[in-house]
Amino acid sequence: MLFRIWLEGHRERIKPRMIPGNTLPEELRENALRPLRQLNAYYAKRDPELADDCIDETILPDDMLILGTCPGEIFHGRKWTRHLLQCDWKYWGRLTLDVEKCALSRAGTALYFVLPAQVRLDHFVFSIPIRITGILEEREGLWYISKLQFINNLNTAYVIGAWIAALVMTASLLLGLLWVMA
């Protein structure tokens, strides 16, 4: 199972699936990518004390909505955005955003973005591909993140297969122990 996750993550790094976006004027694209580059820099530092600085520079905290990789991870507002950033930086792993491969699409006055990323979990030796989607909004000439969704970019069939294999192996071990003890 771990090999399959590693292999899929490796494939995504070598030949990532491209996501189409709009062709935007270069100046607009560069300005819109500013908060994503800054967010990437803060994730590289992984300093929980910098969570408020990160929010002030990259995020619209009052409108912020973040959906994490787990079903129960729904964060709204400044307090919960700070909580997510601090926990990610303390416990999750090293997240690297591939900002240059970000696809941007106009959505009225806002921009929708999709970008590939990798997370190297602290206690494992492999990276998991992540896809991050969200909304950028312009305020006073600067772009800020107002919505984020982190998505595990893995084939869930591998996870289900691993669970089934683990259950079969556990049942086999228990039956073997019962047979030896009889």
Where are these regions (language model features)?
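Short, low-complexity N-terminal intrinsically disordered segments enriched in polar/charged residues
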Residues: 1-53, 166
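Short beta-strand edge/turn micro-motifs at domain boundaries
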Residues: 129-159
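A solvent-exposed, acidic/Ser-Thr-rich amphipathic alpha-helical stretch
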Residues: 52-109
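Hydrophobic/aromatic beta-strand elements that line small-molecule binding cavities or substrate pockets
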Residues: 99-104, 117-119, 131-137
